Amino acid sequence: MGFTVVYLSLIVLIPLAALFLRAAGIGWSDFWDMIKDPRVLASFKLTFSTSFYAALTNAVFGFIVAWVLSRYTFPGRRFIDAVVDLPFALPTAASGITLSILYGKQGWIGALLPFRVTYTQLGIFVALTFIGLPFVVRAVQPAIDDIERELEEVAASLGASRWKTFWKVLFPGLLPALLTGFTMAFARAIGEYGSVIFIRGNKAVFGDEMVPYGGIIAPEIIFDKLVVSTPESLNQATAIAVTMLIVSFVLLFVINMLQLWGTRKYRETR
């Protein structure tokens, strides 16, 4: 128990405490001025909205992938199961370079598309979806494996269709695992930096229009401020990091409460 507390303190609690202590020394007025900067606000909007949509996309397609891998046997199944974990193993920079090559104007995929992916918000979305998919698949797949086949047999014997059996019997039990995967994918996307800067590049292009601040994610602003390394830039990096941390914690807390509610609701109906 003592070792656990010490380890947790060194890895998580002490760094977070140091961050909040530095933020407390900035002063509320200066803190607020740093946060309401248009460039920072735009980066928050881009970071959280794109992370949410990427996690939501992964929740849908990650669930389908997990279901297929769990319920069906087919040639190449083990290979696909291993490929799912590839974003875990790849360095984020390697992921960004790979996606940039694939989705660039001359890339295998980008050359076939009638619209641009690299240097756009869509490119950021692609990168965040890529790195978040394994979190959903690996959270949902064990839950699907643990489903009792008797539940489906009983539902079928009572005249329920396969679709109704899925939505009324199976899905409620899988929802907590799906929310867990969504939460992890969302949290991972919020802090992603390496893969995004390669596919987004040094400019943000939306249609034919150059949009100032529109393509910069919050982690990139934090990094830029740390590189400058002046007292003012370090304070702004701290303010942005603390704000992201608080907002992320609130969002994850709400999602976890929904997950807990779903689990209790499912147990009550069984």
Model feature map: region roles:
Residues 10, 45, 49-61, 65, ...:
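Hydrophobic alpha-helical transmembrane segments of multipass integral membrane proteins
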Residues 28-36, 41, 76-77, 96-130, ...:
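Membrane-interfacial helix termini and adjacent extracytoplasmic/periplasmic loops
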Residues 2-7, 56, 86, 90, ...:
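Transmembrane alpha-helices
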Residues 44, 69, 86, 150-158, ...:
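Short hydrophobic faces within alpha-helices
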Residues 1-18:
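N-terminal signal-anchor/first transmembrane alpha helix
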Residues 19-56, 68-72, 224-234:
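Periplasmic/extracellular loop-to-transmembrane helix junction in inner-membrane transport proteins
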Residues 31, 53-84, 97, 101, ...:
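Transmembrane-helix boundary motif in ABC transporter permease subunits
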Residues 38, 190, 196-263:
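Interhelical loop and adjacent transmembrane-helix boundary motif
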